[in-house]
Design a protein with these regions (language model features):
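Soluble C-terminal extramembrane regulatory/interaction domains of multi-pass membrane proteins
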Residues: 81-176
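Hydrophobic alpha-helical membrane segments, chiefly transmembrane helices and signal peptide h-regions
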Residues: 1-2
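Membrane-proximal, non-transmembrane interface segments of integral membrane proteins
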Residues: 5-103
Length: 176
């Protein structure tokens, strides 16, 4: 019982899961690609073969990629929403010329959709860059030792900053 005298529910509170992304869309494909990079970065971080000099950068890359994936999924759902709205507008107005105001609204939605998808593509490219850089450094350090790649290990931090910035800007753009 709580202070109001009512019994508390015995079932746990369930948080609604976000809706699934529309199948067969570019945005769903981009999020799936990010899932692949997150999975591989997780495996890389746990790899016994990962040189010690890359342990911290690998953890940071994984955390950044997971955060990027979360932002990308929210943005992809926003693109799905725009796709749904555009589909409905076209289905209802089929064969009719839109009014100037409706045409302007449709143009804004298409423009926003295009900008969000371009930002998703760029964000994925940033994750790819960090991932491949870590793989390259891991191979190089395995072959030549830690003394040869100090500056390059530091450059991973810079790439991570660029990645975080790209997804921070994407999140702001999606909120507009």
């Amino acid at each position: 019982m709580n202070f109001s005298g009512r019994a508390r529910p015995t079932h746990p509170v369930r948080h609604a899961r976000p809706p699934a992304l529309r199948r067969g869309t570019e945005q769903a494909s981009l999020v799936r690609a990010l899932d692949g990079y997150v999975g591989d970065l997780s495996a890389l971080r746990l790899s016994a073969d990962l040189p010690d000099a890359l342990r911290d950068p690998a953890v940071e890359a994984l955390v950044a990629a997971r955060g990027a994936r979360d932002v990308a999924a929210r943005v992809a759902r926003a693109v799905d929403g725009l796709d749904t709205a555009l589909d409905r507008a076209h289905d209802i107005g089929q064969g009719l010329t839109p009014s100037p105001a409706a045409a302007a609204t449709l143009a804004r939605m298409y423009d926003r959709r295009d900008r969000l998808l371009a930002a998703l593509r760029e964000g994925l490219a940033q994750v790819q860059d960090v991932h491949t850089t870590l793989l390259e450094l891991s191979a190089r350090l395995e072959l030549y030792g830690a003394g040869t790649a100090g500056a390059e290990v530091g450059a991973v931090g810079h790439r991570l900053d660029v990645l975080r910035q790209a997804f921070g800007q994407l999140e702001v753009a999606a909120a507009r």
